[in-house]
Amino acid sequence: MLGLALCCAGVQAQVPAQVPAIGQGPGYHDPRSPFKPLQEREGVLSWSLLSSVSTKAEKNRLVPTFPAPVQALNQKKVKVQGFMMPLEPGDKQRHFLLSSVPTSCSFCVPAGAEGLIEVFTQQPVRYTLEPVLVEGVLAVLSDDPYGLFYRINGGQGLGAP
């Protein structure tokens, strides 16, 4: 299921230059979305920081280059807010993607790898369309087989931000 969810991760929506950026962080927040964009919060990891990664093409893949402030977060306990993208059936999830923007299409990933975090939680988190707050140990990934840049292990759902 993860492979299916990530099949479009490297393909971001092409937004005409005249359309202003809506929301913060990577990805595209559809202005017709019933969900408000995430707001920066003190003590919560910024999607703007996570999206400051750059990539270079090597062989048939994109290899991330993380700035020092992002590398410094590797194996640190962080809090991050985002929108759940379940990877398994059921209303409670232990393994899901957290996105910087809400999904607006059931077949597409709303952001690239810089706007997604794979999350593994100790206790199940109830799926919701509203933003959630998660705390756990962040892994900064430079060579993930699925092309992910970030993962939270040992996470715990903290409810709504």
Language-model segments: residues:
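Bacterial N-terminal signal peptides
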Residues: M1-A9
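OB-fold and OB-like single-stranded nucleic-acid-recognition modules
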Residues: A13-P161
